[in-house]
Amino acid sequence: MILGIGTDLCDIRRIENSLERFGERFTHRVFTDGEREKCDRRAARGPSYARRFAAKEACAKALGTGMSQGVFWRDMEVINAASGQPTLRLTGGAREHLARMVPPGHEARLHVTLTDEPPLAQAFVIIEAVPVAGAS
């Protein structure tokens, strides 16, 4: 069953301006160490950061919290599965809120898609609850 859907459209130029103007103050406030490491290895950092920013916004919308109710930027980390497919790792308030959303006998699955076509980056997040095998 679908528990939440979120989407966000982010102007890459806005993220590039924040990177230029605020530098590490911006990246350390919004992104995890792993996200910063991955983005900073890219020649075009702006689109990479913008996709992740959009994913965090979309996830907060799917959670139904926005950036409130104890959910913070760094509670949501864009990671890649072994296949390269993007997904999200939730910690802190985001993880706690997700746990409250999931009905007994189910587990959460997060589906993420990211894209960019300058000057825009976009993300969709779907939170799904699937039955746990053997749960009654």
UniProtKB/Swiss-Prot annotation:
One of its GO terms (cellular component) is cytoplasm. Gene3D superfamilies: 4'-phosphopantetheinyl transferase domain. Its EC number is 2.7.8.7. Mg(2+) binds at residues 8, 57. Its cofactor is Mg(2+). The keyword Lipid biosynthesis applies. One of its GO terms (molecular function) is magnesium ion binding. GO terms for biological process: fatty acid biosynthetic process. This is Holo-[acyl-carrier-protein] synthase. It comes from Methylorubrum populi (strain ATCC BAA-705 / NCIMB 13946 / BJ001).
